[in-house]
């Protein structure tokens, strides 16, 4: 029997075994079998303690908040970027969270990092360790939605980590005079004691202000304070602290190690005698609170305070902290951790990594009174730490001179809220080690003496003004734990920030200078900020290439004024006509698109509008243009005008607009709705002859540049652009909106529907959905008319997309829908993003970056994937028994290798440009050499897909699209769900297009000849 061409071959049928099919009946399986089957596919841990993972020597990242680029982009897209954002109000350092998340969503990671570091010099540290659930996340408006709040800490960590990989140093504010030309007051000697978060923050802001004689004295051999010594490596790696210290040192701040308060004669008095006019105390609370029952116990006996234990763990696990590698504390058996704060849970999870078999966290009050943030407690719970509430330590049980247990008394809360210890209720716990984490204090007599002459409070710490951070001596300031206001790293950072302003104010007062009553601290700066993104077109110099299109964002002149104040380089007026052509709009008229699926809120991929031109008169716009040019002489204003096909009208309106002092004109020949019925807009712009004549009329009537705004709703936009060129236009705008019908409801009525009859018309689609059309138009015009100026519009919503249009041949960029999605402040993101994209082109070490995106490392859930396949000899998926095998192999390796990590490393910290930094003009039309006719494409250089099994999450999307939309070239293992590419792969790239993990699938050169499957022999011999 002859083979049927319309039936799959047997080998293809086997490939299709797991391909989805429409369900025709209900299936039946026993409960027992399903309980067993689920274990094979389980990704989350089993609830039983039998599944406990050995964590000894494993200091890999455990934070749930850590994000890959994919995760960061998805999370940033969810953010509403709210007005008067509550998250910002809940941040101690007042981070502009809305702005930095906006930058992340636009792939401008430097812009995000700049926003973060401008308000928080320890932005990466805080992104990793901030108790966000109690701060910014606690105020997120998305708490009122089903999907919950934004992972702000993870986004903050992601952006600053990417910037750290760029290796770009911090610089002084470029607007400051050189150090030699700064006033004498800025050479004041300033000392900071303690190199922890508060001092690093304070010194950074003082250096940004221009002070150049700043020294930090640190008693330890290492920097970073508690960030280094007490926060574990798996929460805060040492290289993060080093990165932030290096940024501070970039500004000239000096750090002196092994010289602390009360050490080697260092006192407040001695510093003053040495010529320091201001001292900032940021030494924390260096001694542990120690309950009386532990008096005399030592680490050799099995007793540690958190101040003993955590630094030992840090020195052994944080490579670079010390010159030599020390050993972890050797724990075993049962460990009791006393306390209910973040430090207690750090001790508990660290104990597991030091060999403890089981850890009990014991605290005096109940779960509802735990001081630790939920993130910390949850991490300990997931690692199978046990919690014992309502217990107060009463007596240490010893055996052979060592700790062998602890006797507790039950605590109870009375009706009046007070707590009592009931000694009749006794609990005995066996323990091999006890770690006390009952807080900290200052009780070193040498330090207390060195603090003289400032007054101390009843706790033995300085009296500090909560607003100025001054002590009782006006030249001495304090912050962080020792000041008594901060309980977290970010609050200590803010103490330093707050003090820096008042130190500045104090120093200037000594020199008779008055400064602003409102604090105004400098922003973070690096060389990226100095990149020139101005561009000249038609003899007009644009401060930057980003401007507002003639659209709803320029409804009024006052809106344009506000846009210029925010930094927009140019703006077009809303299109206006002669008074005889005045219009009145209908409503509703601007609606969200359906091109992004069911996404509600900002981030819409498109809008549809049936809005007409401006309802305001030509006189209004001409007077407004004159006002704006007078107040913003460096900004460019283009008057957008429209008439019917009438030479007298075009002549009159063009002359009127020119006399208003507009820098240029835009001829709107493309409005796709409403105006065409009046013989205007689209009615003029679809005929090359009409376009050519209108341009000739305007050229004859005016002397300033003008640009014809083209419609994409034509067969060949190049013909229209050529007509404009032949008519004397100085350039064109490409493109206006695409004519469309956005949505029909279930009852067949349209949206928008006007009036009782719910009538509509075809409107203009704008936004990202039309970007491919606009890019095609811009590149086609640029190829046909080399050097002809193009103002691009159509889906420009970021610096990255803007650069695409510049590469395609545009000179400047018009924006509308992106502002409708957000607000005028996006201009800061666009400018910084473009500066970064240009700057990074000059750094050879980053040649493998895609814009601001670093190469994707192998990861799962944003965390680097150790090369376990090298340990077990094969790649396995991350679920069920395979995950267990991988976890056990890694645990054994970690234990045997003393915690050395097998994973990719980051880039060097400092990268210096070795090539000239391109300007905007240098990148215009760079992509055109890659665009041409299909016949120019080489069909001998074939590629095929390659799946990275270590990054694959086993969803099978590649498999399904290849089966039902492609070439049945992917096998899908029924047990491991790992896809395998066969030689049948044609390199179509559908699999990569639907893969949810960035770079899990890559297209690589084909190693075997490609032979198309023709179905039947070509010209068979009969």
From Swiss-Prot:
The keyword Metal-binding applies. Substrate binds at residues 609, 668-670, 736-737. It holds the Pfam family Pyr_redox_2. GO terms for biological process: beta-alanine biosynthetic process; thymidine catabolic process; thymine catabolic process; uracil catabolic process. Its EC number is 1.3.1.2. Keywords: 4Fe-4S, Cytoplasm, FAD, Flavoprotein, FMN, Iron, Iron-sulfur, Metal-binding, NADP, Nucleotide-binding, Oxidoreductase, Repeat. The active site is at 671 (proton acceptor). It catalyses: 5,6-dihydrouracil + NADP(+) = uracil + NADPH + H(+); 5,6-dihydrothymine + NADP(+) = thymine + NADPH + H(+). The keyword Ion transport does not apply. NADP(+) binds at residues 340-343, 364-365, 371, 437-439, 481-487. InterPro entries: 4Fe4S_Fe-S-bd (IPR017896), 4Fe4S_Fe_S_CS (IPR017900), Aldolase_TIM (IPR013785), Dihydroorotate_DH_cat (IPR005720), DPD_II (IPR028261), FAD/NAD-bd_sf (IPR036188), FAD/NAD-binding_dom (IPR023753), Helical_ferredxn (IPR009051). FMN binds at residues 550, 574-575, 709, 767, 793-795, 816-817. Its main location: cytoplasm. FAD binds at residues 129, 194-198, 218-226, 235, 261, 480-489. GO terms for molecular function: 4 iron, 4 sulfur cluster binding; dihydropyrimidine dehydrogenase (NADP+) activity; metal ion binding; NADP binding; uracil binding. [4Fe-4S] cluster 3 binds at residues 952, 955, 958, 962. Residues 26-45 are annotated as: Disordered. This is Dihydropyrimidine dehydrogenase [NADP(+)]. It comes from Danio rerio (Zebrafish). The lineage of its organism: Eukaryota, Metazoa, Chordata, Craniata, Vertebrata.
């Amino acid at each position: 029997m002859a083979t049927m061409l319309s039936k799959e071959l047997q080998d293809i049928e086997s490939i299709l075994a797991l391909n989805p099919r429409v369900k025709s009946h209900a299936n039946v399986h026993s409960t027992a079998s399903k309980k067993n089957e689920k274990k094979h596919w389980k990704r989350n841990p089993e609830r039983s303690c039998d599944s406990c993972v050995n964590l000894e020597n494993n200091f890999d990242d455990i934070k749930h908040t850590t994000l890959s680029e994919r995760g960061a982009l998805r999370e940033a897209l969810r953010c509403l970027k709210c007005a008067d954002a509550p998250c910002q109000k809940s941040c101690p350092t007042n981070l502009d969270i809305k702005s930095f998340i906006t930058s992340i969503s636009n792939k401008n990671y430097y812009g995000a990092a700049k926003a973060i570091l401008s308000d928080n010099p320890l932005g990466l540290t805080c992104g990793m360790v901030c108790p966000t659930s109690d701060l910014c996340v606690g105020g997120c408006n998305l708490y009122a939605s089903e999907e919950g709040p934004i992972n702000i800490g993870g986004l903050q960590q992601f952006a600053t980590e990417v910037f750290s990989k760029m290796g770009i140093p911090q610089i002084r504010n470029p607007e400051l005079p050189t150090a030699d030309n700064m006033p004498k007051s800025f050479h004041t000697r300033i000392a900071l004691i303690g190199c922890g978060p508060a001092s690093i923050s304070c010194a950074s802001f003082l250096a940004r202000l221009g002070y150049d004689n700043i020294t930090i004295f640190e008693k330890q051999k290492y920097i970073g304070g508690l960030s280094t010594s007490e926060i574990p490596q798996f929460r805060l790696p040492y290289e993060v602290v080093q990165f932030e210290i290096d940024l501070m040192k970039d500004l000239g701040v000096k750090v002196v190690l092994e010289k602390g308060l009360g050490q080697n004669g260092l006192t407040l008095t001695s510093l003053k005698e040495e010529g320091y006019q201001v001292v900032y105390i940021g030494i924390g609370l260096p001694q542990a609170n120690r309950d009386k029952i532990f008096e005399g116990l030592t680490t050799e006996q099995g007793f540690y305070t958190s101040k003993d234990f955590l630094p030992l763990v840090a020195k052994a696990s944080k490579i670079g902290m010390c010159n030599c590698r020390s050993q972890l504390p050797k724990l075993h058996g049962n460990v009791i951790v006393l306390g209910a704060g973040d430090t207690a849970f750090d001790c508990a999870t660290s104990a597991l990594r030091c060999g403890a078999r089981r850890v009990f966290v014991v605290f005096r009050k109940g779960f509802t009174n735990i001081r630790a943030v939920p993130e910390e407690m949850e991490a300990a719970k997931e690692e199978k730490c046990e919690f014992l509430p309502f217990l107060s330590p009463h007596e240490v049980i010893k055996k052979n001179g060592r700790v062998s247990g602890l006797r507790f008394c039950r605590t109870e809360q009375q009706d009046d809220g007070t707590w009592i210890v009931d000694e009749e209720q006794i609990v005995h716990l066996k323990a091999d080690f006890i770690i006390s984490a009952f807080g900290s204090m200052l009780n070193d007599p040498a330090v207390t003496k060195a603090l003289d002459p400032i007054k101390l409070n009843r706790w033995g710490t300085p009296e500090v003004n909560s607003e100025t951070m001054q002590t009782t001596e006006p030249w001495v300031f304090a912050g962080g734990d020792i000041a008594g206001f901060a309980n977290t790293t970010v609050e200590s950072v803010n103490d330093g920030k707050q003090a820096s302003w008042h130190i500045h104010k104090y120093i200037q007062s000594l020199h008779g200078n008055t400064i602003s009553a409102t604090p105004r601290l400098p922003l973070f700066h690096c060389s990226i900020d100095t990149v020139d993104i101005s561009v000249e077109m038609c003899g007009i110099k644009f401060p930057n290439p980003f401007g507002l299109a003639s659209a709803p964002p320029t409804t009024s002149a006052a809106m344009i004024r506000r846009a210029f104040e925010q930094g927009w380089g140019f703006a077009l007026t809303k299109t206006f006509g002669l008074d005889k052509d005045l219009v009145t709009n209908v409503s509703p008229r601007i609606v969200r698109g359906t091109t992004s699926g069911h996404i509600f809120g900002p981030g819409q991929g498109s809008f549809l509008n049936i809005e007409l031109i401006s309802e305001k008169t030509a006189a209004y716009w001409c007077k407004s243009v004159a006002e704006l040019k007078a107040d913003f002489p460096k900004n460019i204003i283009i008057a957008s005008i429209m008439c019917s096909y009438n030479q007298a009208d075009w002549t009159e309106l063009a002359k009127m607009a020119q006399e208003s002092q507009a820098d240029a004109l835009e001829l709107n020949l493309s409005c796709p709705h409403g105006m065409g019925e009046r013989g205007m807009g689209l009615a003029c712009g679809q005929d090359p002859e009409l376009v050519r004549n209108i341009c000739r009329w305007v050229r004859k009537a005016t002397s300033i540049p003008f640009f014809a705004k083209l419609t994409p709703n034509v067969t060949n936009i190049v013909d229209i652009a050529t007509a404009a060129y032949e008519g004397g236009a100085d350039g064109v705008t490409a493109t206006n909106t695409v004519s469309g019908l956005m949505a029909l409801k279930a009852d067949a009525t349209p949206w928008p529907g006007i009036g009782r009859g719910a009538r509509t018309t075809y409107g203009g689609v704008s936004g990202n959905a039309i970007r491919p059309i606009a890019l095609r138009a811009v590149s086609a015009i640029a190829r046909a008319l080399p050097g002809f100026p193009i103002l691009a519009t159509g889906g420009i919503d970021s610096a990255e997309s803007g650069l695409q249009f510049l590469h395609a041949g545009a000179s400047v960029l018009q924006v509308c829908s992106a502002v409708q999605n957000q607000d005028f402040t996006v201009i800061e993101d666009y400018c910084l993003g473009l500066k970064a994209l240009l700057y990074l082109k000059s750094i050879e070490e980053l040649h493998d970056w895609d814009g601001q995106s670093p190469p994707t490392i192998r990861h799962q859930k944003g965390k680097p994937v150790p090369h376990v396949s090298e340990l077990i000899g094969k790649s396995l998926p991350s679920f069920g028994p395979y995950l267990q095998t991988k976890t056990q192999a890694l645990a054994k390796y970690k234990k045997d290798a003393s915690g050395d990590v097998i994973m990719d490393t980051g880039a060097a910290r400092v990268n210096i440009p070795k090539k000239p930094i391109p300007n905007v003009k240098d990148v215009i039309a760079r992509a055109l050499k890659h665009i041409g006719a299909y016949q120019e494409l080489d069909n001998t250089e074939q590629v095929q897909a390659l799946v990275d099994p270590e990054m694959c999450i086993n969803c099978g999307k590649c498999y399904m699209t290849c089966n039902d939309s492609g070439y049945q070239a992917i096998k899908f293992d029924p047990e491991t769900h790992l896809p395998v590419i066969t030689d049948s792969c044609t390199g179509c790239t559908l699999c990569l297009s639907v893969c949810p993990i960035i770079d899990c699938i890559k297209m690589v050169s084909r190693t075997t000849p490609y032979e198309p499957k023709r179905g039947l022999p070509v010209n068979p011999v009969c």
